[in-house]
Amino acid sequence: MSAKDFLVELGTEELPPKALKSLGDAFLAGIEKGLKAAGLNYAASRVYAAPRRLAVLVEQLEEQQADRSMNLDGPPIQAAFDADGNPTQAALGFARKCGVDIAEIDRSGAKLRFAQHIPGQPAVNLLPTIVQDSLNDLPIPKRMRWAARRDEFVRPTQWLVMLFGDAVVDCEILAQKAGRVSRGHRFHANREVRISSPANYAEDLRSAYVLADFAERREIISRRVDELAAAEQGTAIVPPALLDEVTALVEWPVPLVCSFEERFLEVPQEALISTMQDNQKYFCLLDAGGKLLPRFITVANIESKDPAQIVSGNEKVVRPRLTDAEFFFKQDKKQKLEGFNQRLANVVFQAQLGSVFDKAQRVSALAGFIAREVGGDEARAARAGLLSKCDLATEMVGEFPEMQGIAGYYYALNDGEPQDVALALNEQYMPRGAGAELPSTLTGAAVAVADKLDTLVGIFGIGMLPTGSKDPYALRRAALGVLRILIEKGLDLDLAAAVDFAVAQYAGKVKSDGLAAQVLEFIFDRLRARYEDEGIEVAVYQAVRAVNPTSPLDFDQRVQAVQAFRKLPQAEALAAANKRVSNLLSKAEGGVAAQVEAHYFDNPSEFALHAAIQQADQAVQPLAAARQYNEALAKLASLREPVDAFFEAVLVNAEDARVRANRYALLARLRGLFLGVADISVLG
């Protein structure tokens, strides 16, 4: 079947830069979906997205749908006609459904059947609807109208190119009549651009100073920014989201180096970087030591004959913003950081839980407790907790919310606070996302865990639990943050004790009955998802959860040991044996004796198992106490043979009550050894 290239380009006013890439991808996906639904095959497809246009090129698109046959089965013959051979309502209804007379229905089989040959339509007849549907389905939160038209789109449309082969597809979409005329660069080539063919689309626009390919513009910007940064003996900060946004702002990218006064470098560089990136869309430069250079790179949308004028203009624009940051920094430093707590006493953390200052006091006490438990400095952790929210009341954070914690760090250093106390003011918010950086100091870790536990206990205490996708206080993230810090930093904290301490801090503001258990359950449930992501089966998590370790680090060490144990050849048999033992002991009447009496043994397998258990107990107890769970389970794996022999040779529920009770006691000893690590019966 013959095929031609197809091109559609919708010209608009400037599209939202943060949405341009996703709009282009969605446009392509919609076209591909429509072609597939229509049964039109093609060789390849690609999207073009620039500030004033969205386009899709489809290579070697079939010119015609294939013919197809449609067979519809109706009611059985017996139900289709009465005794006199007249069609019943069922038969007549089937004919109406098929859009034909009953005489055209095939009655030769067991059921009525209608066979229809459907000739394929020309692709050119289908393309307008496919394009229109794709545009209608674009992820546009809020569409707009313009002029007196009723059409709606993300921005007013200006032109439409639609070519199938060399011919224009005759249609009108979004108030634009299709043609072959596009537009060039707004300044370099502000004229009509005739698209000679779909295949020449990109080159025709390139000659008019428009790089329609988003990926090409992105690569040019990235490469040129790196080259310019290297020429300045620096490295550019190029966040992917910023690179995408800048790419979406320009049709003909020309990166240029600009500078600012070195006096601004006295301001925390994070504030300068924030305002230059977020407000001005500049790429900042760092030296080899990670310090901000007094230079930045802007990306112009024009190849100017006088680039110095563009540079000068950008330098003038950025100066007031840097001056503002400098002013806020100097104003904040006029008083001690701790003094800002007075303002926080009037700022509500949560209506039922008190002020932000109340929270800081709770975090201070809890951070001191945690630091003491994990080997940190209690006094410095408590100090960091007290200062932890102070910068929220500063001018700097008021203007740059993303500076919370960072501003506190600089102000604490300015006040002469210890380095780890200052760092903790920023590290309290770590990790800021999945896989993000963790606190580098024990003081920071203590404050970070304390802050999250305080929030969990408080919000749970007033009954505002997360439901479904709603989690306004980010409690799931807080719980995962606690777990990551304690496990990945190797901090052995009894979480039950820490949560109890946190509950006590609220002193009547929350419903404390069962609160600690509820919070612990929520936190440890988050571990389940963590392990699933790591490829560890739920049964392994459940085996450890059954013995209820309250230290996340201890919990993780047990999980890793059970995961390794599962790979041993003895694991399956021992898990099954433990399950059998668990079932037997659950049915024991009158409890199970604590001591095993060897004189009640009447089978060699009992003596052998008892001796093996005693030997394993001596080896395993010190290993379990030292949390060498891998080694402990490896030792216990040696019990497989005596356990198998015991169950093969002995009837546990002997008729003699004393013998039966003694065998229960022996099995209880066996099960107790494994429960020192995990309940491996769950694995069976």
Curated annotation (Swiss-Prot):
Coiled-coil stretches: none
Known catalytic reactions:
tRNA(Gly) + glycine + ATP = glycyl-tRNA(Gly) + AMP + diphosphate
Query: What does the record give as EC number?
Result: 6.1.1.14
* Listed SUPFAM superfamilies: HD-domain/PDEase-like
Q: Where in the cell is it found?
A: Cytoplasm
Q: Which GO terms describe its biological process?
A: arginyl-tRNA aminoacylation; glycyl-tRNA aminoacylation
Q: Name one GO molecular function term.
A: ATP binding
Keyword presence, Cytoplasm: yes
Q: What Pfam families does this protein map onto? A: DALR_1 (PF05746), tRNA_synt_2f (PF02092)
Give TM regions: none
| GO annotations of cellular component type | cytosol
Asked whether the UniProt record includes Ubl conjugation among its keywords, one would answer no
Name the UniProt key words of this record, in alphabetical order: Aminoacyl-tRNA synthetase, ATP-binding, Cytoplasm, Ligase, Nucleotide-binding, Protein biosynthesis
* Family, per entry: Belongs to the class-II aminoacyl-tRNA synthetase family.
Q: What do we know about how this protein assembles, alone or with others?
A: Tetramer of two alpha and two beta subunits.
The family database entries (NCBIfam families) matched by this protein are listed as: glyS (TIGR00211)
Q: What is this protein called?
A: Glycine--tRNA ligase beta subunit
